[in-house]
A protein has these predicted regions:
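Short, glycine- and small/hydrophobic-rich beta-strand elements in well-ordered beta-sheets
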Residues: 5, 47-74, 101-116, 192-215, ...
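Short, well-ordered beta-strand segments in beta-rich or mixed alpha/beta enzyme
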Residues: 19, 69-84, 170-175, 210-233
Length: 268
């Protein structure tokens, strides 16, 4: 029996872009009312189209959502789910052509892809391939692994290409797995990592795409849920020992139909 790989198989779905902006309120308030109204209407129409996403039967949702950032880290967060990086780039360029764009200063962004780690399935698939006499890394091995994951991919399509939840609040944060001298997530045996990963779920992977390894989006109608969930995670071994967390961004949903309220400072 050859030594089995320690790298779990993963499934990838929607490409995800977070854009964080500051809004130039000083310049905005200097505009005549009719110009502000026209710019607001233009952006509202664009956002409504992005919110609706793909309406074709059997297509991926491919939606976007706007959130009003709470605190000093920014004013607005746009989240985009799309099938490809090219589609995300088209969204960026489309936004750049709007009359609203000169009032937006992008302070940060985060690029990732929806990821499901197949820890338990990987061990079974690797064992089955080894029993057939296949060697890890060979074309036959890779083809066998691809066939096995393709079946799982089809059954998990709704999780890999999700619609944006309609919840009122968003909590977004990036995170890494520790690789210190005494604690290194990646040197733990895959069976041990699988056991620990049952305690939480990573939503989007960004290794090779952005500065952190994963990005996590939490949606809820009660923001206290975020506090309770993250506090509970502190007691999970996978988080307490191996996780490094980045900044947390908390925001409130702004629908296209309510964008005028946001511009007027009356968002409920």
């Amino acid at each position: 029996m050859p030594e089995l790989p320690q790298v779990p198989l993963t499934l990838e779905g929607s490409n995800v872009l977070h854009q964080i902006f500051r809004f130039d309120w000083t310049a905005w308030k200097k505009l005549p009312l009719d110009e502000r109204t026209a710019i607001s209407a233009e952006f509202s129409a664009l956002l409504a189209r992005w919110e609706a996403g793909n309406t074709e039967p059997n297509g991926h949702p491919n939606q976007s959502a706007l959130f009003s950032q709470i605190g000093h880290k920014g004013d607005l967060i746009l989240i985009h789910f799309r099938d490809s990086l090219e589609d995300l780039n088209r969204v960026e360029l489309e936004l750049a052509q709007t009359s609203l764009y000169p009032f937006l200063q992008q302070t940060s962004s985060y690029l990732s892809v929806v990821e499901l780690g197949l820890y338990e399935s990987s061990e079974k698939i690797y064992a089955q391939l080894a029993e057939k006499g296949l060697e890890p890394g060979t074309p036959e091995w890779n083809a066998g692994a691809g066939e096995a994951t393709a079946r799982t991919f089809a059954s998990l399509s709704s999780r890999l290409f999700p619609a944006i939840p309609p919840a009122k609040y968003l909590c977004f944060y990036p995170m890494d797995r520790k690789r210190g001298e005494q604690v290194n997530w990646y040197t733990e045996p895959m069976a041990d990592r699988r056991t620990m990963m049952h305690e939480r779920q990573i939503i989007t992977g960004s290794i090779g795409l952005d500065d952190w390894e994963w990005g996590v989006d939490l949606f809820a109608d009660d923001p206290i849920i975020f506090k309770k969930l993250i506090y509970e995670m502190r007691f999970d071994k996978v988080s307490a020992v191996y996780a490094s967390f980045g900044q947390f961004f908390l925001s409130v949903r702004v629908h296209a139909a309510n964008i005028n309220q946001w511009f007027d400072g009356t968002l409920a």
